Curated annotation (Swiss-Prot):
This is tRNA pseudouridine synthase A. InterPro entries: PsdUridine_synth_cat_dom_sf, PsdUridine_synth_TruA, PsdUridine_synth_TruA_a/b_dom, PsdUridine_synth_TruA_C, TruA/RsuA/RluB/E/F_N. The lineage of its organism: Bacteria, Pseudomonadati, Pseudomonadota, Gammaproteobacteria, Enterobacterales. It comes from Wigglesworthia glossinidia brevipalpis. Keywords: Isomerase, tRNA processing. Its EC number is 5.4.99.12. Coiled coil: none annotated. Substrate binds at residue 110. Homodimer. GO terms for biological process: tRNA pseudouridine synthesis. Belongs to the tRNA pseudouridine synthase TruA family. CDD domains: PseudoU_synth_EcTruA. It is an enzyme of class 5 (isomerase). SUPFAM superfamilies: Pseudouridine synthase.
Amino acid sequence: MKKLAAGISYQGNNYCGWQSQKNIISIQEYVELALFKFSGEKIKIYCAGRTDAKVHALLQVVHFYTDIKRSYRQWILGVNSYLPYDISIMWVIKVHNNFHARYSAIAKKYLYLIHNNISRSGIFRKYCFNVFISLNINDMKKAAQKLIGKHDFSSFKGSECQSKTTYRVIYYIRINKYKEYIFVEIKANSFLNHMMRNIIGNLIEIGKGKKSKEWMSELLFLKNNKFSIFSADPKGLYLSNVYYPFYFNIPKFNFKLKNFLKIF
C-alpha cells in the first residue's frame, strides 16, 4: 500500500463545506466517491484544511492510501472524469509515509475578494463579497498591521473553535485594490475556525469608518470573540496556498495575484 497526495481546486458555492456530513452535499464526499469509481477501492482522504460552506479553494491538499497502480496522469484524468465541473484534481504524487496533508503543513494562505461598488457584480457575485459603501483602504492597511506576528487570536475565533491554543502567527497581510475590487491576502502558520472571515469582517468595518484603526489592537487585548461580531461572507474566501517543508517535494503552487487580476 502506498500513500499519495493530491492538489485540488474547487468552487464552494454548491457545497456545505469540505467535510462529509450526513444528508448534506460536501466536497469530501464527492472526491471520495470519484476515487471509489475510479479505483474500485473505498478510499478515505485527509485534507490540509476543512473549508466552510461556500468557501473556495485555489489549492487544497489531501493525502490517501491505495493499492491501485496507476500513473499520475491516469489518476488525474480518471478521477476528474467522475467529479462535478466545479471540483478538479490538479496533480497527484507519491509521498513519504510521514507526510500528512494537515499536520505536515507549516503555513497556509487565504485570499479574500471584496467587490467595493455601489452596484453588485453580476458576473462574479458568487465569488466575492459586495460592499456598497466606499472603503478606506489605507485605514484597513494600517489596522491590519497590528495583527502581524504572534498573538492570541481568541477575539477572532468562531464559536465552534476546538483548537487547543488560540495563539497563531501571521506572517503578512497584503491589501490591494484593482478597479472596484479589493484583494486581501493573509499568510499564517495556521488559522482558527472562522479566524480569516472575522478578520476580514472587522477590516471592512474599519474601512467603512464604523470602527477606528485601533480596533484590531483592542480586539487582541480583549481576547474575547463576543466583541468581534463582524464576520465576512464565506463566498469571498479562497484557500489559496498550503506550504510544506521542502523535503516532502510537494508541488509548488505559483499563485500570483497579478494573474488573478487579469480575470477582472
